[in-house]
Amino acid sequence: MLGIEEIAYYVPERRVSNYNRKEKFNITDEFIKEKIGVEQIAVKADNENTTDLCLRAYDKLKEKIQISSDEIDLLVVVTQNPDYSLPQTSAIFQGKMGLKTSCASFDISLGCSGFVYGLSIVQSFMAANKMKKGLLFTADPYSKIIDTDDKNTSLIFGDGSAVTLISENPIFVTEDISYGTSGVDYKDLICENGVLYMNGRGIANFAIKEVPPDILNLLSRNNLTIRDIDKYLIHQGSRFIVSSIAKKLDVEEEKVPYDIYDYGNTVSSSIPILLEKILKDKSVKRVIASGFGVGLSWANAILTRVR
């Protein structure tokens, strides 16, 4: 049985305060705290690239669990901001870390739904190829493509990375996953000519419309109710989006963690960062992991504790 054994993450030390940009964007303290829910964003160093963020997360993982580079059978990186257009970021990482040459590697081009998709892909690939240990990285440094004069993006997105160890000794396993795509709205979150554009209102409306019913359908087909879930790990798009989804689901606030005031929306890393913080909390038996955004795309997973 394959599943999540351990998670580690890295958030750069450098911060840019949103309070220092109130006058520039004509915003208030209340807007910062309650609407976007990001007081400062994390920004990578100028000499850090996507692979470097992955390496930092991997170093954190090795501090938590004994793992040999020879044990890694699969290396997958979820990113849409790679080091280069080609080769794949995972290959660069394999070379930098000196992992065995029999280690399979590939990238997944997905944004905020990427962690949930990645879990399914990695676990299925490993099972099909009789692999024992795999690493799922999420790293999407949006500071590479953000216009610092754009209110809709520069106040929200922060840099960060996470690595999830998938093995035959899991803490959480995937019970079921649902997926969705709304490609007709792709221009609501798009990078053109190297600059990110986001229709903030459009993305919020999309998430609030599509995510809650999809979660309810997922629960229903597994004979579960809202009350059977201990934590709802909702992609940390903004305070407004997370709160709105929780209200639509009629879930009490303590079941829906929100934790990006200090570093911002880390795209595909936001869910594993949340999950890492409850991984060893045995009172949490079953969680929903919900990712949504670029595509437009969404994916919801039921994760169940097995130890």
Name each model feature, range by range:
Residues 1-46, 148-205, 209, 213, ...:
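Condensing-enzyme catalytic core mediating Claisen C-C bond formation in acyl metabolism
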Residues 4-6, 32, 61, 75, ...:
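Buried hydrophobic positions in well-ordered alpha/beta secondary-structure cores of metabolic enzymes
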Residues 15-16, 87-88, 146-149, 298-302:
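Short acidic, glycine/serine/threonine-rich loops at helix termini
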Residues 25-32, 85-98, 135-142, 187, ...:
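Acidic-glycine-rich active-site phosphate/pyrophosphate-binding loop
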Residues 51, 55, 81-82, 100-102, ...:
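Claisen-condensing/thiolase-fold acyl-transfer catalytic domains that form or cleave C-C bonds
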